[in-house]
Amino acid sequence: MEQNTDWNFLFVFVVGIIGILVGTVLFFENKSNSFSSRFLAAFLFSISIVSINFGLTNTPFFLNFPNLWRVAGWVAFCAPAFSFLYVRSVLFPFKKFDNLCMLLFLPAIVYAIILIPLYILPTTEKLVIIERALRDKALISLEPEVMLPQGWGTLARVYYGILITISEFVLLVKWSNRTDKEKDSQDQSVYVWVFLFTTVSSVLCVLLVIEYFFHLSRFMDLTQQILYSLSGIIMFVSIYLLFKPSLLYGLKPSFQGVNIGTSVIKEKKAIHLSQEQKAIYKEKIV
């Protein structure tokens, strides 16, 4: 049994490290320097940290470092927020945070506040909580030590994920209706990628809700299913972008709502002007 647990942790840990490495490349080395790539990197960072954190419950790590117990509990609420911002920035680009962007991180802030009483507990009390959770792995996802009814924290994360994926599908429908007459192969590929990205996330969230209420699986508990779900998303994103890195360049400017039509028309008009008129014309439009 111990050997299986070690292999489970090794798999989750390796996939989590891959997610962090891919996120680092997206954030620092992406030549397109696009806003959307930064959000995708932040999404990968978030789910990789959560995955590794859950994976460490298969080891004695938290017995040696009890003050790190649940330290990343609020990070799980950041992943859906970054996911929505990524989809939105790809389909409808923006260059600065607005009120909606800030509102998306409100659940993470609220849950971080809820976790504060746990964080300030004495080390001896934390060790008792950790030992009990490691003996009964079901308690890891139920979070009885948090100031909420058991399991509400996990449900809140999953429901928030479902709400976000529904919002992402709404964005996909809006973009599809908006550009129905102007699609080309590159933009269609990006659209398919965003659709698959959203679909995979939503399916995994729905499966976790079903498992939470009906306990259909007899082979692994809810915590293990969360681990493998997060690992599956990380692998899907990493492998897909490995074979299709051009998706990081996003949609063409004409499909991103960039107002370039007016400037193009002005440049065409300027071709037919004299040199003196061109100079005056340029001064007016600069």
Model-derived regions, located:
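Internal transmembrane alpha-helix with an interfacial aromatic "cap," most often the third helix
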Residues: 24, 78-105
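Alpha-helical transmembrane segments of multi-pass integral membrane proteins
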Residues: 30-52, 105, 144-212, 224-233
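Membrane-interface segments at the starts/ends of alpha-helical transmembrane spans
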Residues: 64-65, 135-154, 219-220
